[in-house]
Amino acid sequence: MATIGYIRVSTIDQNIDLQRNALTSANCDRIFEDRISGKIANRPGLKRALKYVNKGDTLVVWKLDRLGRSVKNLVALISELHERGAHFHSLTDSIDTSSAMGRFFFHVMSAPAEMERELIVERTLAGLAAARAQGRLGGHPRAINRHEQEQISRLLEKGHPRQQLAIIFGIGVSTLYRYFPASRIKKRMN
């Protein structure tokens, strides 16, 4: 059961000593760090720390905002730790998910994020139902309509190159192959 520390400062110029001293005092076995904004999703130090964390271990940060800026991301990260059987501890915020009170606080904190996810799903389903009621189907609009499909089919059968047709119809060559696989095109002999 290791204690893994994570330090993050927003710029290279910021001093990490305060965080490092706090994590050292918390008896962290290993400390990982990033010198990057919390808004940036790709944080190599955090990735290494999360890879290092095993079941029964605890990820420790000096302050909650060092781990992430949005509640949604924090909830996802702490949930991932929980699913792996690991714990989370924020020193200055007094959050420790290894205790009943810490887990309770985490659940209270995660409730708004869960509600937001459910509201998004409800709005999406309501929008799709309204569209269906008006005769529209959900999803992306087709890249080419039926009339264009018929035109392209005739042109392909006459031997026109896909690259040329892609330019004319303003679509990608891969779209042409998706709609008209090479095995289905019969070239007419004139």
Swiss-Prot record:
SMART domains: Resolvase (SM00857). GO terms for molecular function: DNA binding; DNA strand exchange activity. It comes from the Bacteria. Residues 162-181 bind DNA. The keyword DNA-binding applies. The keyword DNA-binding applies. Residues 2-135 form the Resolvase/invertase-type recombinase catalytic domain. Keywords: DNA integration, DNA invertase, DNA recombination, DNA-binding. PANTHER family: DNA-INVERTASE FROM LAMBDOID PROPHAGE (PTHR30461), SERINE RECOMBINASE PINE-RELATED (PTHR30461:SF2). A DNA fragment of approximately 900 base pairs, adjacent to the fljB (H2) gene, which specifies the synthesis of phase-2 flagellin, can exist in either orientation with respect to fljB. The orientation of the inversion region controls expression of fljB. The hin gene occupies about two-thirds of the inversion region; it is required for the inversion of the fljB controlling region. This is DNA-invertase. It comes from Salmonella abortus-equi.
